[in-house]
Amino acid sequence: GSEYRQLEGFTRRDWSRMPVNYVWIGDGHGMKMKCRHPVHGRPFAPEVTFVIDGGTRFVVGWSLDLAENVFAVAGAIQHGIRHHGKPFLYYSDNGSGETADILDKEVVGILPRLGINHPTGIAGNPQGRGIIERLNRTLPMRIARKYRTYFGKGADRETLRKTNRDLRSAFTALQQG
């Protein structure tokens, strides 16, 4: 599995010769914070999807959604294309949001119609996308820590317990009118 692969040797890619906008790498990550769900109003943790340029490590696109799905991925890619042009290749994992027909289908898929190649990583091998995995460990946490409802690493457990109690109480009060 992936734990064993961490012990094995690996080949580090040389991204220094990669042209800008040649390879984009994308992945979604759950935010370690709670906010109000726009449909039912209960507290939930939103999903953020980042797309970065492989050569420069610059975040070219992002999307915030209710869950990691094809619309979140497409939104992040759209944001990137709108602001930075079209990549030659979009590299991602094999998640359902990344490999849906809306993105990949030969004739009607967004990526083939734009002429963007879409290879995916080996299932269970996040090391192949280490650049985006590293970003997902740091950037969403820095964003989420700015909110009182942050529940990730380093959050005060007692404060978190009280905050969750207050959130549940507020939701109940809203439902009762």
Map each language-model feature to its residues:
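Mobile-element integrase/transposase regions
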Residues: 1-50, 58, 71-76, 83
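A structural signal for short, well-ordered beta-strand segments and their strand-loop junctions
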Residues: 24-25, 91, 119-120
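Short, flexible loop/turn elements at secondary-structure junctions
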Residues: 27-30, 52-56, 64-68, 94-96, ...
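Short helix/loop capping segments that flank catalytic or ligand/cofactor-binding pockets
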Residues: 33-35, 60, 100-101, 121
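A short, structure-level motif marking secondary-structure boundaries and short turns
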Residues: 39, 62, 91-94
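Acyl-donor binding region in acyl/amide transferases
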Residues: 45, 67-106, 110
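Coil-to-beta-strand transition motifs
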Residues: 54-60, 85, 90
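Globin-like tetrapyrrole-binding proteins
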Residues: 96, 100, 104-177
